């Protein structure tokens, strides 16, 4: 289940005529070529045949490697925003498909609502959940989501749960 929080990173986009994709703000430990937002901008630019570029400015308010989808939501925001800025004309479904190549949880952020996810994150069923309270803790270490899910020691024998079981509280 993906539940959205009323907290997130702040992103700004400035179009460029020279076709370059650049960051206006440094992110310690994340070179531009590994930044999901930069990668999302480059992916959209290539997929839509866009000649313009963009300067991205990101103020991180969510912890890096904290497991709350900060990088994925930034990538999704980049796809949706630059699709508008560049007038690329892609649908949300097309943007979500592009986002899936960046990370399994990018599509849910492209669609922008709470959802039950199946598959690797691309099969989404919208949910209306009660408005709970959340506490976001900032860990003293960062963990790459991809590394966790690709680790051979990850337990993969959990029984599947259905959306009906989840909604029933089972």
Question: Where on the chain are the PLM-derived regions?
Answer:
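ATP-binding N-lobe of GHMP and related small-molecule kinases
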Residues: 1-65, 84-93, 134, 138-141
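Solvent-exposed alpha-helices and their adjacent loops that cap or buttress functional pockets
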Residues: 3-4, 100-101, 107-110, 126-130
């Amino acid at each position: 289940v993906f539940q959205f929080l009323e907290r997130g990173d702040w992103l700004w986009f400035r179009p460029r005529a020279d076709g370059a994709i650049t960051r206006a703000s440094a992110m310690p430990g994340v070179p531009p070529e590994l930044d999901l937002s930069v990668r999302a901008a480059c992916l959209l630019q290539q997929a839509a045949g866009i000649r313009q570029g963009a300067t991205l400015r990101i103020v991180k308010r969510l912890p890096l490697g904290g497991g709350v989808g900060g990088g994925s939501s930034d990538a999704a925001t980049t796809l949706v925003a630059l699709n508008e800025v560049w007038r690329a004309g892609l649908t949300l479904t097309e943007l979500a498909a592009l986002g899936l190549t960046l990370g399994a949880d990018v599509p849910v952020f492209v669609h922008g609502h709470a959802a039950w996810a199946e598959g690797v994150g691309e099969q989404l069923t919208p949910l209306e959940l009660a408005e709970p309270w959340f506490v976001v803790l900032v860990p003293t270490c960062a963990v790459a989501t991809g590394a966790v899910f690709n680790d051979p020691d990850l337990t993969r024998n959990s029984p599947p749960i259905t959306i009906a079981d989840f909604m029933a509280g089972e």
